Amino acid sequence: MESAGLEQLLRELLLPDTERIRRATEQLQIVLRAPAALPALCDLLASAADPQIRQFAAVLTRRRLNTRWRRLAAEQRESLKSLILTALQRETEHCVSLSLAQLSATIFRKEGLEAWPQLLQLLQHSTHSPHSPEREMGLLLLSVVVTSRPEAFQPHHRELLRLLNETLGEVGSPGLLFYSLRTLTTMAPYLSTEDVPLARMLVPKLIMAMQTLIPIDEAKACEALEALDELLESEVPVITPYLSEVLTFCLEVARNVALGNAIRIRILCCLTFLVKVKSKALLKNRLLPPLLHTLFPIVAAEPPPGQLDPEDQDSEEEELEIELMGETPKHFAVQVVDMLALHLPPEKLCPQLMPMLEEALRSESPYQRKAGLLVLAVLSDGAGDHIRQRLLPPLLQIVCKGLEDPSQVVRNAALFALGQFSENLQPHISSYSREVMPLLLAYLKSVPLGHTHHLAKACYALENFVENLGPKVQPYLPELMECMLQLLRNPSSPRAKELAVSALGAIATAAQASLLPYFPAIMEHLREFLLTGREDLQPVQIQSLETLGVLARAVGEPMRPLAEECCQLGLGLCDQVDDPDLRRCTYSLFAALSGLMGEGLAPHLEQITTLMLLSLRSTEGIVPQYDGSSSFLLFDDESDGEEEEELMDEDVEEEDDSEISGYSVENAFFDEKEDTCAAVGEISVNTSVAFLPYMESVFEEVFKLLECPHLNVRKAAHEALGQFCCALHKACQSCPSEPNTAGEERLGQAGGSWGGAGPDWCFSQ
């Protein structure tokens, strides 16, 4: 096809007409298989009048060359390299220049600097050009090719650092500054000790460049701040001599309310990281006071008139998690304080922080009082030991006072603080039940019907406090149960019922057998939720399954008569509802029931293990992420002949040239795998001999998860494998046989070296 015909097809793809795009895509897939397609694309990327067509042609050419570069004749490769560099020098549209630079980077990954000296010559000439547009093009090209293969430029680091020292001083050219910072971002992890003197010279200019970029383009400035992150993380000490200047710059941006939230949040993230990696230097240089004096006003900032902070709103339409979830500078400033508590000695942090806390808590402003409570909440994590030993009574008194504050925003913060104290200050906090429980119960009763967001905060604090009380919960059990059962009886929202069912689990954990008088009423409500077909009650169903598992462990023997019914309910829901949270809660229920039923669970093991194997094998929730210039994946539909030819090609193309830039995995699916491992391990031990027919297949799938990228899943897989060893040993003792004994020996040997033995070896006869 001539370039004019190809251009018309590309125009069709740019129209807002789905049907025409579909037809044009089908035609284009056919056209692009022809040998003449590549010359036509090259003609368009260099000479088409419409910049959109030039850009599209460059993207398609890059995609084409990505898998076919080695097939081209040497002359054609040299011609293409020359054409692309010429087009790049002539191009005036930024979007096209970027696509041409990315095309150059694709070729560079395959050729390298030695095989493409013209690229290096162009970079050297353009980046030192006296003409600003040409220089900006050179820096754009440099940033893209360095990012594509940074190790190739290590021999040129000194030359590049000298160049960046010049370009970062060009405060009148924002484009130059941005691409210089992008280049520095990529280089930073590869800097060596020899590079340090030149790299340190860039730090003041980096700050100046950021100060120039922020008023012009906050989005670009957010991206450019990655350079600061990388230098902070660098193994060589580049930032340290300029730590004070870097901190001053960050604090100036963070406190500037005239700037947008995005750039202030991004700079607060830099501060969080700075505290993590430079905490000792902060103390040594006495930089903690200015940091705290900047953070506190941000935490205490009032929202715009007539508005509330996200966590203080009571909207069921978009309910936030009980944790600090607002995307505002306030919440990220709290995270900086949290990081300070984690990485500074409390005897250094608390004396400077406590006077500010006391002043805030005495303030007439509810947002000042809220700030004090939020800071107390996060202090309980990093400075937990210090608080337990020296400060718990007075600080808990402050939190309890906050629960009775006239302002709802302060009460919300006090509930959050109490929940954090309950998580982080065990077991000491539980000894204050006489002071805390009456306040929590009074608060629960005061929440108006329908205010589920406030109820969620109360339940968060209640659950965290109650579940560790043990027998100390008994005096409060009648009142607690009346509150929870009332929520279940009333025509309240599904969210309110979900919160009540969750709280019942925490109460059961503490109360154990003392819960028996309330057991029939609880089961009546749970059975109702588990049998409902209402879609809006699905979260309540999931929570009911989780609470049912907790009840099975807490109540124990009295629940045995209901074990078979609970098992059937769980299996039925797994058949009806496709949801990872529902499955993981059901598996936890099965694990709890296995402790009651033992080998009595045998009739259901085939169905249970089948479900669990599907969860262990599932790749659901793993979503490929494509780079920003995806070209409709027009080359995915290649003929089998071409694929076979490519497989036989001696020059195997690099996998990282794919347009898939990474994968995202929804946390729910990792949680499902983690809980599946935990449940199947427990079931194997409790059901003993009955589990043996399923041991091999389950072992194989759990073994594969030792390579899972998610730490918690790997940990759960290791624990499950250990439980399989215990289960097989137990089965051999109760039912000795030659195959069982041999299997136990092999499993034990494999358990001693998971890294070297595979499941096939372990179970081979």
Task: Give the location of each predicted region.
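Karyopherin-beta/Importin-beta family HEAT-repeat alpha-solenoid scaffold
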Residues: 1-765
